[in-house]
Amino acid sequence: MFRIGQGFDVHAFEEGRPLIIGGITIPHEKGLVGHSDADVLLHTVTDAALGAIGEGDIGRHFPDTDPAFKDADSAKLLEYIWKIVEDKGYILGNVDCTIMAQRPKMAPYIEQMQNRIAELLHAEPSQVNVKATTTERLGFTGREEGIAAMATILLMKK
């Protein structure tokens, strides 16, 4: 049996915060705003996994009104959800991710992101695809106000 899930997330830039995407800290003058560490890519993968197993979304499991998740490491949140995925008897088929950002350029960090996500999902890097695009200076990402990401995941019954 196969299950498919989709995730989407957006975070605005803010000075004085680190920029963490896909579990990798990227040098940039601004980071992303969020209750947790605001890792827009790991949030989309988490939401995609939750959607695939019919368990709602990241906000249901880790509400931004709960102080326990203030500045939480998104990798830890994904690990928690991935245990639920595995407990339900699923493994990763593949996950395909897209980051939408005008700046900074993501290309130098894509392989590291893929490796980190594969590690978190107990999978091979070949099962994880991360790509990045600009929005040709259109919209909030084009104006460099923030970053968006989306992911589609395929789970397979063990």
Curated annotation (Swiss-Prot):
Pfam families linked: YgbB
EC numbers on record: 4.6.1.12
Ligand binding (4-CDP-2-C-methyl-D-erythritol 2-phosphate): 9-11, 35-36, 57-59, 62-66, 101-107, 133-136, 140, 143
Catalysed transformations (reactions): 4-CDP-2-C-methyl-D-erythritol 2-phosphate = 2-C-methyl-D-erythritol 2,4-cyclic diphosphate + CMP
Site keyed Transition state stabilizer: positions: H35, T134
InterPro entries linked: MECDP_synthase, MECDP_synthase_CS, MECDP_synthase_sf
Pathway(s): Isoprenoid biosynthesis; isopentenyl diphosphate biosynthesis via DXP pathway; isopentenyl diphosphate from 1-deoxy-D-xylulose 5-phosphate: step 4/6
Keywords: Isoprene biosynthesis, Lyase, Metal-binding
GO molecular function: 2-C-methyl-D-erythritol 2,4-cyclodiphosphate synthase activity; metal ion binding
Source superkingdom: Bacteria
Matches recorded under SUPFAM superfamilies: IpsF-like
Needed co-factor(s): a divalent metal cation
Alphabetical GO biological process terms: isopentenyl diphosphate biosynthetic process, methylerythritol 4-phosphate pathway; terpenoid biosynthetic process
Chain residues that bind a divalent metal cation: D9, H11, H43
Co-factor note (free text): Binds 1 divalent metal cation per subunit.
Family the entry assigns: Belongs to the IspF family.
NCBIfam families: ispF (TIGR00151)
Function comment: Involved in the biosynthesis of isopentenyl diphosphate (IPP) and dimethylallyl diphosphate (DMAPP), two major building blocks of isoprenoid compounds. Catalyzes the conversion of 4-diphosphocytidyl-2-C-methyl-D-erythritol 2-phosphate (CDP-ME2P) to 2-C-methyl-D-erythritol 2,4-cyclodiphosphate (ME-CPP) with a corresponding release of cytidine 5-monophosphate (CMP).
Self-association state and partner proteins as the record states: Homotrimer.
Protein name: 2-C-methyl-D-erythritol 2,4-cyclodiphosphate synthase
Species for this entry: Lysinibacillus sphaericus (strain C3-41)
Gene: ispF
